[in-house]
Amino acid sequence: MDGRGLTLRSKNRRPRPQISAPKPISGPLPQNHQPAASGSGTASSGSGSRDYASSNHATSDLVKRRYSTRFNQVPDFDGAPPVPSVPQVPSAYAGLGPPQPSRKQSAESSGPPEVDLTALRDPSLPVDRYVTNLLANASEDDIREYQQALRKVKNRTSTDLQQNVYQNRTQFIRISQEADKLKGEMKTLRSLMAELTTALGQTAIGDSPNPMSPTLDERASKRSNRSSVANLESMWNVQLQTLWKTVEGSQKFLPMVPGRHIVLETGNWAELDSATWKPRRPVHLVLLNDHLLVAAKKRKRVDQSNPNHRGPVPTKLIAEECWPLQDIDMIDLGANLTGSAREEAEDRGITNAVCVRVGSKPFTYRHDKRNSTAKSELLATFRKTVEDLRRTLRSETEAAGKNGESLGFMSAINSRNSLLCSPKLDLSENTDNPRDRPEVRIDVDGKQQNLRWVDSQVDELDIDIALQRFEEAVSNIDRLRKLARGLKGNAVAQDVINTKVDERAAKLAGILSRSLVDTHGFPVATKTNVVWLTRLGFEDQARESYLKARSDVISKRIRTYQQCFPSVMTSACIKWAKHHLDAFNALLTRQLSSVQRGATVWQNCINIVHEQAGILAEVGVDFTDLVAKELELTEEEKAARPEMTRSESLIMGLADAASFFNMYGH
């Protein structure tokens, strides 16, 4: 074994050790046995340990060689191509994936899902898929809270939309007014440039004699007239420049326009509160030939550290309001007062006050001196100035109309159509001079108003519709329609008012129809909406909207019940009921076979059967037409109805007696 070496596959194995049977120890071993055993063990311990160590080392080396592997060519892992990247999910569907399950399933939910406004603003959002993925693991309470959050977002969005509409409408009105002012200034500049061009052209003409030219005397008279007009214009320009220096901010209200001049300037006035008649601030009134300027008196800033300052506090005038004379009315508040009312008005000083009405806004001004004639002078001058202005505008309009007659009838028709179709009526578009404006006035409650007043009323109507003040909007539409019907002699104003009012009425009717559809289940709201639509003249639209809403509800309920009770279950139920009904009819026919048809007993039995069928009809099972269908009497049998036999009368008597005994016997 030593010559061939050690191997694990050697067939010459050592014999297995045999374990001897246990030997009982009955007494101590002999003394000569212990040394011998110990001596032999000691002698063989050195050689045995060395042989065991060498054999153990060789065996472990062979085991390592047996279970080890040698690779001649190691694969090159560094030279392998890179792993391809995962494709990105589109951003529109990034949040629509299924919710990943959490590692820790908590007993309590993490709360309702939040409302993602960014996702809801996406117009291409797949709503069904989004809601399904969002509420996949939500409880009933979470879904209810999420629904309430969506309602709050909807209400907040609706409120923001209404506020934005109102703000945009107000800004649009303000911008349109500024555009009108800018348009007037541009036309004024155009006219001034035209006059300048004409003057330069006239100066370029030579002084050659003309046989058609006037004489020297005529030239002198015309030159004097021109010089007087020029002097008057220069004087008016000086007045305006002085006004600009005296009243701060008046130049933006009253720019330099040819022919504009000051007619009357009066002070010592106070603006009053229209509700309490208490003075607000001292004002200064300036009446021009085409405008009325109101300037407020305010104190100047004074250096208190200056010791030389003495006397009253200096004041300055600041322009606050300026209105065209065509847009205002001036009323004497003390003209129609009598008796105790006049005495009370005199105590308050109202007899010296005037009211300036601009559209629907009143402004009250009172003179400080009660015995002064400033109020009467202001009223007389105002009326005379307004009359002169109207006469001038009328003459200029007639002259412009005569010059434009050569354009023909079609041009007039086209201008009228453009006037009616324009969203914002402006009669100054066809004229080059702001003074060449056709004056279209209407009579409103005994007062003359122009079409700007109509535009202001239409603007208020738009604001009422935007703020959903439906009662005020419907009342304003009725009032404007009544006003248009009264303008029989003014076709242009009547057409303009009807066009604008009909457009707003159609818009308001659409809003009310949608409200009627949303609240058709509430009687009070439905009645209110129907009344408003009837007043607007949209009865047919109200009827169709209400009936369509009710039809949609009925169709929805029918679909709901059909989903709850499929056709298979319905057919089985009807089949079961028909089977039992046929069995009952057969039993009833068999029981009444021994009774004569048409007799009293027969008829009583049929009546009882129909009463029982009526009870079933009360719970929704109507078998009245099918119960005892073949036992009904014909018309001939009813006419030839037999009399009750003796046995039948006896049976009926016993039955009546039994019923009477049951009722009163106990």
Swiss-Prot record:
GO cellular component, one term: transport vesicle
Keyword Transferase recorded: no
The protein's name: Exocyst complex component exo84
Composition bias type Low complexity, residue spans: 36-55
Keywords tagged on the record: Coiled coil, Cytoplasmic vesicle, Exocytosis, Protein transport, Transport
Role noted for this protein: Involved in the secretory pathway as part of the exocyst complex which tethers secretory vesicles to the sites of exocytosis. Plays a role in both the assembly of the exocyst and the polarization of this complex to specific sites of the plasma membrane for exocytosis. Also involved in assembly of the spliceosome.
Gene: exo84
Coiled coil: 133-200
InterPro entries, per the entry: Cullin_repeat-like_dom_sf (IPR016159), Exo84 (IPR033961), Exo84_C (IPR032403), Exo84_C_1 (IPR042561), PH-like_dom_sf (IPR011993)
Quaternary structure and interacting proteins, as annotated: Component of the exocyst complex.
Primary site of residence: cytoplasm
Region feature Disordered, mapped onto this chain: 1-120, 203-228
Organism for this UniProt entry: Emericella nidulans (strain FGSC A4 / ATCC 38163 / CBS 112.46 / NRRL 194 / M139) (Aspergillus nidulans)
A GO biological process held by the record: protein transport
Annotated Gene3D superfamilies: Exo84p, N-terminal helical domain (1.20.58.1210), Pleckstrin-homology domain (PH domain)/Phosphotyrosine-binding domain (PTB) (2.30.29.30)
